[in-house]
Amino acid sequence: SQYSSVDAIKRIIPADRKNTLIAVMINCGDYDAELLPQYDGTGPDCIRVCFHKAQALQAVELCRKIKEKGYKVYFQPMVALSYSDAEYLGLIGMANKFRPDGFYIVDSHGSMKQKDVARFFYLIENNLDKEIAVGFHSHNNLQLSYSNAQYLAALHTEHNLIIDSSIMGMGRGAGNLNTELFVEYLNETAGADYSTEPILCSIDNTI
């Protein structure tokens, strides 16, 4: 793990975080929720629980414990393509019961085509409680992160939509969706008003 404790994360969070929500990921089975301090607003705000298919029940219990400590929690079943429709609906049913703040479509191997994204989004849109946000976490092995994100952003949905990205697509393996590309797309097509200059400066200064 990059950070073994909340205290280690607190040391790198700016004193003035403004309106930024700080999120971290936990791999189910790698961290004991009993070690997690009560949320106090000085560390991470959101915890994303990543898990494999065989860990679903364990992940639900971990999410419950995290919620009880006051954090926002996101349910992140890895390798979405490994689930049948019935299995994925089962996950959605679990989420509706314990009510995470978000439920993620995860393209762990970067192998999802648009039809795959559409399939999982359809299952979520028609079955997940509308108060639960929908997230999309992609990897760019087939260079489809950008087009898949465009597809999702164009859909009409009652859910809040979260699309993960990173500067220059930094991420494991083939990387993720490029923030600098996607915010420009949103500015041009969705009426967004993101400033790209700070993003490009971050790339120049840190990469």
Please report, for each region that a protein language model flagged, where it lies by residue:
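Catalytic cores and adjacent flexible loops of soluble metabolic enzymes
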Residues: 1-207
